[in-house]
Every structure is written in structure tokens, then in C-alpha cells.
A protein has these predicted regions:
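Oxyanion-hole/transition-state-stabilizing segment in secreted/luminal serine hydrolases
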Residues: 41-54, 66-104, 129-131
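N-terminal secretory targeting modules
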Residues: 1-35, 40-51, 205-206
């Protein structure tokens, strides 16, 4: 089943974006910005990554590369980040977009940041695995690891960005998103975020 965006989710997204616009006037420039969808939004950055880093969470649930490209200024660029950590694409797969189109939009996001915010280092996280087990089908819908793997293979060679591959940290012996690390086959549990903390600190923050 292809995922559609419900009106109440759109209202939430617009409300969260408006909150960002208001915050942009007050926040210091040059912080480390994490941008993406719900997996980023639900990432309690200071809890898992510590308070030694100037971290800003700019995740918005239910968004995809179409949304992020359209709202990049308000969500990211106005903060003039020292580093940008991107995690986007799983909802594009959920909406049935061709892999080639997803890659092109993410490439456009990266190039726009590099042109508009010259001092920003851009890091692109691999799209995370899902669990294709039957109990998670209602949430995961048409998302699948074959598509995620195809997308990641192309994201890994994009120019102008540091690609950070976290995929295997989250998989079980069958290559699925580990039950311990997920709440619903798609989103991460506290244990899932915890297992990513050290590689993110090592590869990006330190």
C-alpha cells in the first residue's frame, strides 16, 4: 500500500515549520543541524549524543525529499549550520517515488546547501532498514529493504557530501531491522537510537 499524507499530518508539519521560522531569529548560527523525517524528529539528540555539542533537531515527521528541498531555507539554511546531518528518503520509498528521482532530489538538497551555506559540512546518513515481518506491515507498507539498498548504493557515491553508512548497525541476522531497535518496523526504539550514538559521534561530531 502506497502511503498518503493525511490532512492532520500536513497541519502538524506546517505548524512545526512555523515554529522553526520563529526559532531561526533566536538561535545561534554555526550549530550542528540534524534534518529529516520522524526518525530524526524523534531522535533525542542531547540525550543520546551528549550536551558537549551544539545540536539542533530539524526533523519533521512524515516528510520526504520533496518537502525538504522545498523548505530547506526555513528548516536548515537560515541557521547557517557548521555541520548538517541529513537523513531522508524512507518516506519517498513509502510514496512509491522512483529511486532515480529520490537520488536526484537529495543531490539537489546537497548542492543547494553547498551553494547557499559555503562553510557548512554536509553529512548524509544511509537510509535505515525496515522490518518486513508481517506484524509490521500496516506501518511499513510498501517500504522494503531491496529499495532501501538500491537507494543507499546510489547515495553513497553522491559528490559534495560525506556519506555515513549506519545500516548494518540496525540489522538482525536476516538483514531486517532488528526487533530490539524498532517500535513498529520503521521507527527506532530507544535502543535503536542508542546503538547509533557512538558511530555518529565518531564519524561526525568528534
Amino acid at each position: 500500500m502506497i502511503e498518503t499524507t493525511r490532512p492532520e499530518l500536513v497541519a502538524y508539519q506546517e505548524e512545526r515549520l512555523a515554529k522553526f521560522v520563529n526559532e531561526n531569529q533566536k538561535l545561534d548560527k554555526g550549530q550542528i543541524v540534524f534534518a529529516g523525517d520522524s526518525i530524526t524528529e524523534f531522535f533525542a539528540l542531547k540525550k543520546y549524543l551528549g550536551r558537549d555539542f551544539p545540536l539542533v533537531n530539524r526533523g519533521i515527521a512524515g516528510t520526504d525529499s520533496v518537502w525538504l528541498l522545498e523548505h530547506l531555507k526555513e528548516q536548515v539554511l537560515d541557521l547557517e549550520p557548521s555541520k548538517l546531518v541529513l537523513l531522508i528518503g524512507i518516506n519517498d520509498i513509502g510514496r512509491g517515488y522512483p529511486i532515480r528521482d529520490i537520488v536526484n532530489r537529495i543531490s539537489d538538497i546537497i548542492m543547494t546547501v553547498r551553494q547557499e551555506s559555503l562553510l557548512t559540512e554536509v553529512y548524509l546518513l544511509s537510509v535505515f532498514p525496515v522490518s518486513e515481518k508481517s506484524q509490521y506491515a500496516a506501518k511499513v507498507k510498501i517500504r522494503n529493504n531491496a529499495s532501501v539498498g538500491e537507494l543507499n548504493q546510489q547515495l553513497a557515491v553522491l559528490p559534495g557530501v560525506t556519506y555515513v553508512d549506519l545500516y548494518d548497525y540496525l540489522t538482525d541476522a536476516q538483514g531486517q531491522l532488528n526487533d530490539t531497535y524498532t517500535t513498529d518496523g520503521l521507527h527506532l526504539s530507544p535502543q535503536g537510537y542508542q546503538v547509533l550514538a557512538e558511530p555518529i559521534k565518531k564519524e561526525i561530531l568528534e
